[in-house]
A protein has these predicted regions:
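Nucleotide-activated sugar donor-binding and catalytic core shared by glycosyltransferases
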Residues: 1-288
């Protein structure tokens, strides 16, 4: 947004129609930007249904259109080809430590040590690491060390794998939306530089950081899945939260139920087509 808004001002002054796709997270921080977006753009297209409600509640919704999330289409394609569940008596734990090398350096040691704790307590866990294609294999091997020989590594499409697994440990971000689409109980971990974390605490105005929790919130700010942030993100806590899902079927089922409800915030398949139609409508004068 700090780049796009000045650009949008220049385009608007030049008479170039501006459509914001997607809406910045004004509902989470720096909400004053919403009026600027409304003034500069012909329209704002949102991924999540609650974002449209947020704009409506502030009298800014007349030119906001909820188009839905393109991941829904991707999920429909991937989930159409199911992955086998673990063998009887086995539990599958999936790790998604992020897509950027910086995230991997912060989170993979945490997940490595957490799986070591779990392996020392129980012998029924199969660990699968989803490696983003943007992450060098050498970096993963360097950090994972001997644990790599006990893990299965996958890259590429993985939503069907998530849907056929028991628990996901995941970096906060878009990957939690993938977990929501797969309706898998998850433990969300988040570590950033201390200064970034302190600034975030001052600026961010929502109780949860994981999109999976924000989307599945029934309205009371409660968490569907645990978030372990900064100092709370320790190997012991991660292992503890994973075992709570593995050993409490009712808790896991409730998480899946709430995640399924949260999927409704993403819309039905067809988001790319709806987005294109909305942009064409706005350019034809469907909104100011």
């Amino acid at each position: 947004p700090d780049f796009h808004l000045p650009l949008a001002r220049r385009l608007a002054r030049a008479g170039v129609p501006v459509v914001f796709y997607v809406s910045p997270q004004v509902w989470a921080w720096r909400s004053g930007r919403a009026k600027t977006l409304s003034r500069l753009g012909r329209g704002i297209l949102t991924l999540f249904r609650f974002e449209k409600r947020w704009y409506d509640a502030r009298g800014l919704g007349s030119h906001v259109t909820w188009v839905g999330h393109p991941l829904v289409d991707e999920a429909a394609r991937e989930l159409a080809v199911p992955v086998a569940r673990p063998q009887e008596g086995r539990r599958r734990l999936v790790l998604m430590p992020g897509s950027r090398p910086g995230e991997i350096r912060k989170l993979l040691p945490l997940l490595r040590d957490a799986t070591a704790i779990l392996s020392s307590r129980r012998s029924d866990i199969d660990v699968v690491l989803v490696k983003a294609e943007s992450v060098p294999e050498e970096l993963v091997a360097e950090i994972a060390g001997d644990a790599l020989s006990r893990w299965t590594i996958v890259s590429g499409p993985h939503l069907a794998l998530l849907a056929a697994s028991d628990v996901l440990v995941v970096a906060s971000g878009t990957a939690t939306v993938e977990g929501l689409l797969a309706e898998i109980p998850m433990v969300v971990v988040y570590r950033v530089a201390t200064l970034s974390y302190l600034l975030g605490k001052l600026l961010v105005k929502v109780p949860n950081v994981a999109m999976a929790n924000i989307l599945s919130d029934p309205g009371d700010g409660s968490q569907t899945v645990p978030e372990l942030i900064q100092g709370a993100a320790t190997p012991e806590r991660v292992a503890e939260e994973v075992e709570r899902f593995l050993d409490d079927p009712a808790r896991a089922a409730e998480a899946r139920r709430r995640l399924a409800l949260g999927r409704e915030e993403l819309g039905a398949p067809g988001a790319p087509d709806r987005t294109a139609d909305a942009i064409l409508d706005l350019l034809r004068g469907g909104a100011r």
